[in-house]
Amino acid sequence: MAIIAILIIGVEAVLLYFLAPIMRLAVKYSKFNRPMAFRLLKSTLFLVFVIAISCGNRSGNKNSIQTVVSQNTVNTDSIAGIQNSKLILGANRTEAYLPLLKGKKVVVVGNPSSLILKKELPNGEKTYVHLVDSLLSLDINLVKVFSPEHGFRGTADAGETVKDGKDPKTGLPVISLYGSNKKPKPEQLAGVDMLVFDIQDVGVRFYSYIATLHYVMQAAAEASIPVIVLDRPNPNGSYVDGPVMEAEHTSFLGMHAGVPLVHGMTIGEYAQMMAEEKWLKTQKDVDLTVIPMKNYDHKMQYSLPVRPSPNLPNDQAVMLYPSLGLCEGTTLNAGRGTKMQFQIIGAPFLPAEKYAFNYTPQPNFGSKNPKFKGENCNGLDLREVPRLNKVDLSFIINAYRNYEKKDAFFNTKNFTAHAGTAKLQKQIESGLSLEEIETSWQKEIQNFLNIRSKYLLYE
């Protein structure tokens, strides 16, 4: 305190020395008397100095908060001052990962969702740049791109084979990680120093981007190549629910036994869980770095800036996807072939008196050959359904009960792959109630929650 007092007196003396001529001039042509002018100037100078010290102290506090957050902590005392600040994606935290990429040969695993927020206007309008374009502009040595299902530019149908090629905008080689080449080959990783994974997931087990991440991390571990995951929000991250994957039914639609249909984790959290729980099944551990978000929590509602895949066109579709995605294993059309993908369901054989919404699927972007192409479907319009916080099986259960050809309702192999268990189809066919079915998976969900809790980066 004594040092501060001496500093204040010293600064005041210096300022008065240089400003004395100005003060004399002001007094000469002012109605204020000399003592009043002197006191006013002194008060003004003192106030300016105090404000400067105060601003400096606030800057120091801000830096300490950023340091705490960047250390990946969820200590609520540490982040209380910035909980109302805007969300910062992992991809936007260039200061955290650019030093790791300098001088390295880098491969990006990405698709159209790999966006960085460039600027936000006062009216809320946002401008984005693709991660690949951003890294190239910062002189990062990108050597190629790996792309997941739907391709790097996101134009392929679900399940459609995506061929290797060259990105027309950047000229970079694009290697498909879908179809027969789901895992990067050793020759495709030759000479690579770093892998950067940045893809928007939607938090649903049968959404294939987690499987792609699994294979990328597995190949990286075997080749001793570090992996950086740029974390993004989970739009379905506020709850954990649904049937749990059984080991005998694991596939590209669900790689890990014991995981519920909705896991409630960000892709960065899930990556850490895969690595630490030894789900990669590699002799070497993967060298994994997760760049966490700032100011995020699992209850936050996040509106995606672009569709994460061709048939999830908006937030409503993303919200309903955990419930309606199971329709892929039934005879029901879930909106493919319309602009209302995963917001409507229907089929020609549902009774019109109970399913009054009509639509006709036609080939379109994301669905070249939809179920019931060109046929009138009776169904439900779910575009106004309020936000769900669970997997709602009522849509499928009621459709099954109202479907005339019950033996043709399920595609057993596909439904089991999506559900992760053969039990769910049997439960629906045997007439169990929604509540009975939901109760049947609660014990397994609790087991998963115990594992999940070890890897959460956010509240």
Where do the protein language model's features map onto the residues?
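Glycine-rich, aromatic-lined ligand/substrate-binding cores of catalytic
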Residues: 294-372
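Glycine-rich oxoanion-binding loops at beta->alpha junctions
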Residues: 162-191, 204
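C-terminal motif of bacterial Sec signal peptides marking the signal peptidase cleavage site
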Residues: 53-54
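Coil residues (strongly favoring Ser/Thr
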Residues: 77-78, 134
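Glycine-rich, charge-decorated loop segments at or immediately adjacent to ligand/cofactor-binding or catalytic sites
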Residues: 153-158, 229-250
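Conserved anion/nucleotide-ligand pocket segment
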Residues: 251-320
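Glycine/threonine-rich flexible loop motifs
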Residues: 201-213
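Conserved functional hotspot residues or short segments at active or partner-binding sites
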Residues: 341, 345-440
